Amino acid sequence: LIANEQVPEGDKLPSLIKMDQVLNSNSPLTAIKSISYGQSMLAVRLAQARGYTDGVYLNQNGDVVETGSANIVILKNEKFITPSLESGCLPGITRQILIKHFGISEELFSWDEMLESDAVFLCSSIRLLIPVSKVEGKLFEKNPLGEKLIGDLNQIIRSKIEL
């Protein structure tokens, strides 16, 4: 089952902050989605307490992993990139669709590389793909390539749903 929310506008778009807690990409629990959402809720609550909507986890090597509620996609030099599974991220359904159908690249990248990117997006089964408005102090404008990818993803999802 895939759900889809409307893309929020302006200041309702997600904003991200770096979490102090580090994820261990070598943990045997890495990439296992469980019914325990404690760590995910921690990221969201700590971020909200600081005026952001979600927190970004890094692994022990300083690589971006994911947020408390979604996988991450960045756009850098007209190339969409999501953290590789080696980072310790969950192999989310929407992430897998983006890789399979849109050629999104899987690579390791740092917090600084994310800040230097042209755009940042969150992807999840609930939101599909949504642009991020701010990562700590850096504001991100809407990006035409990102808007096209969002539209194309929504179209492919709708084409697979039988009513």
Regions found by a protein language model. Give the residues of each.
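Helix-start/capping segments and mature chain N-termini
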Residues: L1-L163
